[in-house]
């Protein structure tokens, strides 16, 4: 039914676009800058002294069978990915150089996409966004100045698809293991009246998930309308998605995996009135997010151009969760009135978010100088609130029982100036200066119960930050095929909402500061390229993952005074023939905390005990990552065999050997064949085998510990959970372009 609806809508739009296109002969000479730039010129080029990788739409298309964007980038240098459901669809995330997603800046057309409070990007709210992208650039390290939260390990710069000259339509469908499927319809009007274009996409993605009950149901859209003339490009872009995802964030201990299997999922589990294990059907996350962008690119002269944008994002949703034997006082109930202190219950947590702003940049390019200056201002307003629709000891509550509500507000203003100057032939200097001001407030009552005051946690946070982030470097291109560069960057970043609300100490978390040194060399000719990038990232007050999760499955972090990440990224590509390419890259790194002191709590909350471990590995930061890909293209057939090896990762910063993610090596095989049928531009069929050699592995987890007192002696304990990933699984696809 859904596929029929998609095809019907596509045929209507495609037919209409043909009618209008006939009336306006396409004259490409009257349309300038159709491949418009984003509102902020934050892209790195071969003259920018930073480490970066570009991934084209063609590369994305070959592997885009429904997995989220992080999984489409997993073979780029220093990248590892995670998946709650175990197969790359649903709640997924990405780490670069060991840095988690809350410290990776993500933009679309230069507009910030990270959540203003959590700093993460929930890809589940942007399903199939890869189908509407022109390309993606990943900058590793501090990178160039950009909008939104600071880049502390990397930035991901996405550029949405260009408008086309000719009417077109496309239909893609995929199906595979775990009932995973994706249906996508894309249409383009072509050029209307020599000035206008309209492009649209709708997608549906679903899966039962590898992990038990980890089902995902996703819908999304993309729509852009553009106006073009000789000196002006004006685009309105909107995209959004709705998701319904069953919780799978509890993961499983090794003991649970042994007893119940690797797919065991405790989320929603309870004991019914007959003493049987049951699962709550509505243990789902339900969220809708809609993004709107209005982007203007204006050429003022042959050397000067102006970019401006307005943007707005609306998000709202909720999730329900069955909780067993909960203390009723934690939910605002009077135990005396109810007649019991504890009861099973269902809690419903809701969010209503608004994020918007504007940005402006001026670009100058003439002779030896390429310079940009710009500014941006963004504001966020978000309500967090929750209620308990059902309590076992009472039944359905006759009235709405809200037990917490708080509001977060954030204003973020930044200004920057950047210039690349050619000093002599082949040698250029790069300077990038940014000032950023942030005001962040949270007011109200949180969902954490504070036993020190015997009441819900009160929030009255008002924090201000002023950051100056300078960057400078040299880039030297010599002897035709050689390039060398060096850069030094300073980056600073404010804490996230969870750093304030989940901390076990009274004082505010500290802002982080990064000093990033990068030195690289590349050789690139027609058939062979090789390169190396050395980096040293020294942090002051880095907020490192502790290994623990808060009550809603989000990773917790804490400041450490001194830490660093250093390493070398190696990469090579060999093209000995038109039909064969061998690509490989590796990251060898050392990620350490200086003089780490672990704080262990009685019952994980009171009476802290400190243990000094000296210098330790930073959690979730592998020392070695290796990627290899063999790519064959012959006539209309293509094949790629890609392999990733990730070394052992500690899940806490204390280096306990019983709290690690073991090393793993996973290979994926992709096959594709292109041909034509009558009335089509092209047809492509594809088939993928993921985890070809059936590796049993986990790519994420949590860990923690505490102590209790027995007979006057402290007894320490530790625990851990693991995100099991799917064994060998399959996906097939077909694509029609008209």
Positions of the model-derived regions?
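Short, acidic, small-residue-rich periplasmic hinge/interaction motif at the N-terminus
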Residues: 22-62, 101, 533
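Short acidic/polar hinge/loop motifs at secondary-structure boundaries
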Residues: 112-140, 159-160, 256
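Transmembrane beta-barrel wall of Gram-negative outer-membrane proteins
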Residues: 168, 175-206, 211-248, 292-303, ...
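Face-selective signature of the C-terminal outer-membrane beta-barrel domain
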Residues: 287-449, 475-477, 481, 487, ...
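Membrane-embedded beta-barrel scaffold of Gram-negative outer-membrane proteins
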Residues: 299, 305-311, 475-477, 483-489, ...
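C-terminal beta-signal and adjacent terminal beta-strands/loops
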Residues: 582, 592, 647-651, 673-738
